[in-house]
Amino acid sequence: MDMIEHKQVRDLKLKKNSQSDYTQIYIGLDFGTAFTKASYEIASQKHNISSVKFHDTEATDKYFMPSKLYFDDETKTLSMEKTSGALSEIKYFKYTMIDNSLAINENLYKYKDEVKNNLEQLCAMFFLSRVILKIKKAVTENPIIKNSKINSEVEWFINMGVPILETGEKSEIYKTVLTVAYQYAMKHPQGINANLVELDNFFEEKQGRCKS
């Protein structure tokens, strides 16, 4: 399994001080077929790796985010949660996003002519955007960050393991999806739902910049 990296500097102010520099955060993202896990390290705290807790529970599965979404056929909306029995489950997009022959989410494909981009990539982009927000929340709530005495911008490095070679078209798909997911998270930091067409428009706008 190879790694792809996304790097982005965000203006996240911590404590007011005359000093200003960067706090570097290294994120390890395991985008799994069934579950997603994440951990991070603050560069100034070497060998102190923290796992991201995705759920407010003491159960052992609090570190595992199910890699699935739910789709509302009527509103064409993706959701992180199943809010009604009418929503269909969307899963396995980690692999189907790079190979159309593996596509199994039939409810999505009724709308393939209404979007310009691969439907499974849109699912992965939205899912990863919500995961990134949960990771960033965990980082900013870390006492080391909260109690920092510097006025710092946070420089984020995300390493995501993918089941492909580091180079090639499929690697570029994962890189683009991860990068656009980060951008979408910053643009839309609230909510667990997203309209499929709106996601498509955002992805269409941003992916060209990723490739340029």
Task: Specify the residue positions occupied by each region the protein language model found.
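Von Willebrand factor
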Residues: 1-15, 41-58
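Conserved phosphate-binding catalytic cores of ATP/NTP-utilizing and phosphoryl-transfer enzymes
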Residues: 2-24, 190-212
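Gly/Thr-rich phosphate-binding beta-strand-loop-beta motif of the actin/hexokinase/Hsp70
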Residues: 15-47, 87, 212
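An acidic- and aromatic-residue-enriched active-site/binding cleft used to recognize and process polar
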Residues: 31-34, 41, 74, 163-165, ...
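Short, well-ordered alpha-helical packing segments
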Residues: 37, 132, 175-179
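Phosphate-binding loop and its immediate beta->loop->alpha context
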Residues: 44-172
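Glycine-rich phosphate-binding loop and adjoining helix at the ATP-binding site
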Residues: 154, 166-211
